[in-house]
């Protein structure tokens, strides 16, 4: 079992970068899905875009002409269950595919609540609160 404490203590990452096939489609998806979690588009040009809390990018999307690297799993912290539900609904409206609706995941931990989406490039994107 994954213990709740493990999720609160992870601070080893400064940022994550993903190659994307369509920057416009990815920006549309991440703008909609991450807004309920408090993450905003903070940087954008023809080569990429950055998202993060308070305008400090922690997720970078890089426009890439070749195949994107699909299959990554990224989990974003959410403030509450309502934000996770909105992450899922807004993400689906913006082109994401359902990969697990908002709800408890008791097999992860007794307090784990999450939703999962597949982004336009095939990555598994999660919103979670514990």
PLM segments and residue spans:
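Long, contiguous binding/interaction regions
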Residues: 40-44, 72, 82, 94, ...
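Conserved beta-strand in the GNAT
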Residues: 58-62, 116, 125-129
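Leucine-biased recognition of intrinsically disordered, low-complexity hydrophobic segments
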Residues: 1-2
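Long, continuous compositionally biased terminal/linker segments
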Residues: 52-93
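Core segments of cupin and vicinal oxygen chelate
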Residues: 18-58
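Short glycine-enriched loop/turn motifs at secondary-structure junctions
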Residues: 12, 67-70, 109
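N-terminal beta-strand motif that seeds the catalytic metal site of vicinal oxygen chelate
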Residues: 6-27, 74
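Vicinal oxygen chelate
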Residues: 22-24, 76-121
């Amino acid at each position: 079992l994954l213990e709740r404490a493990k999720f609160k203590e992870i601070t080893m990452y400064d940022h994550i970068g993903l190659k994307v096939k369509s920057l416009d489609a990815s920006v549309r998806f991440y703008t909609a899905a991450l807004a309920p979690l408090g993450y905003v588009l903070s940087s954008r040009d023809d080569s990429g875009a950055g998202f993060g809390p308070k305008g400090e990018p922690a997720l970078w999307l890089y426009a890439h002409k070749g195949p994107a690297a699909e299959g990554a799993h990224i989990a974003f912290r959410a403030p509450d269950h309502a934000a996770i539900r909105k992450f899922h609904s807004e993400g689906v409206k913006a082109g994401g595919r359902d990969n697990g609706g908002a709800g408890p995941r008791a097999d992860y931990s007794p307090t784990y609540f999450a939703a999962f989406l597949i982004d336009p490039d095939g990555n598994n994107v999660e919103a979670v609160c514990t």
